[in-house]
UniProtKB/Swiss-Prot annotation:
Disulfide bonds join C54-C138, C187-C273. This is Matrix remodeling-associated protein 8. The keyword NADP does not apply. GO terms for biological process: cell adhesion; cell differentiation. It comes from the Eukaryota. It comes from Xenopus laevis (African clawed frog).
Length: 435
């Protein structure tokens, strides 16, 4: 029984050493060449300000004041016996002891104390039982480098020695172990950021390069070098060093934007921002194509000379240019115009009222007499119409007498004396009206 358990452990170690890189996620770029993560085209004008943005949160440098507690490994059990559960088994920091969460697992599960020196984070489980089967997860966290890696191992328990085996299912290692035996769940990572503690501040560097138009990348000019330790190097002339600048707090914020306060035509070219974190395995490059053009000229109206008038070409048809000028009216002018309108409207109403009154009065009096003649006293029309003496007297005056000759007729007319009579024309008109 013990011999078979030892043989099983040897098989697990051999299988893990042969297949560890099949399921381990690489923590860093083994290729020292920078990876181009972005390409940006920038077009601007002469005199503008230029901002070439280059940011990365992984380049933020924080001093390790907790004695390298920025690396941690922990093992979790995700499911057991077909029932989902998330259970933390143990964890261990690079500068501390390992912590086991359940008393049941004390002295039964463990991780090598030299895991952060040799890179072996495998979990050893003694006297396995049916409650131990499930999906195990080995989690590595590097808070300084912002790295997270996970390795999963499936553990199944059997009571038959013939079913004991180890195989790869395409996603993870599957181990079928015999009950009450000792099992090793493999998890290894030998990258230097998990095994060694270098001087991180000496391995973080950022530099800016510039290529003039037509210059290849390998002949680019270096502008600025910056280190996390605070050292800074600027290249080129004093004017160029003062003109192009990066913030002094770049490593504390992860912002390495290049600022150019006043752009000229000579600033055109290709700019490259290189970010290198050798400890964390970060190598990135961002490319900027900067083009600077002159500002468009605004045409000013030409001044005409009144003394010398240009010759008029008869073949050219002159266009009449009309300029509309709008003057904003004041509030006082508005009230003045409103007063004019109201006064005119009031005068019109008065005239209309006078005409209506005169027309009605004229209709009552009639249209047969003159309005300008003074009015007489009112006379009853029935009395006038029923006065027979006047009518008789009027008829008597119309009588004709036959005379023998004309001489006697003339004498008779001359001898006739008519009594004076007052005639009221207004009364006569009313008589005629009564007839």
């Amino acid at each position: 029984m013990e011999i078979r358990c030892k043989v099983l452990v040897c098989h697990i170690i051999l299988l893990h050493s042969a297949t560890v890189y099949l399921y381990s996620v690489p923590a860093s770029q083994q290729n020292p060449e920078s990876v181009v993560v972005s390409v940006t085209n920038i077009s601007t004008h002469v005199g503008d300000q230029g901002f070439l943005t280059c940011e990365s949160y992984r380049m933020v440098w924080t001093q390790d004041n907790l004695m390298d507690r920025q690396r941690v490994v922990h093992w979790d059990l995700y499911n057991s016996q077909g029932v989902y559960r998330g259970e933390r088994l143990l964890d261990m920091f690079s500068a501390g002891e390992q912590r086991i969460y359940k008393d049941y697992n004390q002295r039964r599960i463990s991780v090598s104390e030299s895991a952060f020196q040799d890179g072996n984070f495998s979990l050893v489980i003694k006297d396995v039982s049916m409650i131990d089967q499930g999906l195990y997860s080995c989690n590595l966290h590097h808070h300084y480098c912002h790295l997270d890696e996970t390795v999963r191992v499936q553990l199944n328990i059997t009571k038959s020695e013939r079913k004991v085996k180890i195989y790869w299912d395409g996603e993870k290692i599957v181990i079928v172990a015999l009950v009450h035996s000792t099992v090793l769940l493999p998890c290894e990572n030998h990258d230097h950021m998990w095994t060694d503690r270098h001087r991180e501040e000496d391995q973080q560097v950022v530099h800016w390069d510039r290529q003039a138009p037509g210059i290849p990348h390998d002949r680019a000019d270096r502008l600025i070098d910056m280190y996390a330790s605070g050292e800074r190097r600027a290249y080129g002339s004093l004017f160029l060093r003062r003109k192009m600048n990066v913030s002094n707090s770049a490593f504390s914020q992860g912002d390495f934007t290049l600022f150019i306060p006043y752009l000229t035509r000579g600033d055109e070219g290709t700019y490259s921002c290189h970010l290198h974190h050798h400890y964390c395995g970060l190598h990135e490059r961002r490319i900027f194509y900067l083009s600077v053009s002159d500002r468009p000229k605004t045409e000013e109206p030409s001044k005409t000379n009144s003394d010398s008038a240009p010759a008029i070409d008869s073949n050219v048809v002159q266009e009449n240019k009309v300029i509309n000028v709008t003057i904003q009216e004041s509030r006082l002018h508005f009230f003045q115009q409103l007063g004019y309108i109201l006064a005119t409207l009031l005068l019109f109403i008065l005239l209309l009222t006078a005409v209506i009154l005169i027309t009605r009065k004229h209709q009552k009096r009639g249209y047969a007499y003159n309005l300008n003649k003074p009015q007489g006293k009112e006379v009853n029309m029935q009395e006038i119409c029923l006065r027979p003496p006047d009518l008789i007297q009027y008829k008597k005056e119309e009588l004709r007498i036959d005379y023998k000759n004309n001489i006697l007729k003339e004498r008779a007319e001359m001898d006739r004396v008519f009594a004076p009579k007052n005639i009221d024309l207004d009364l006569e008109l009313r008589k005629e009206y009564c007839k």
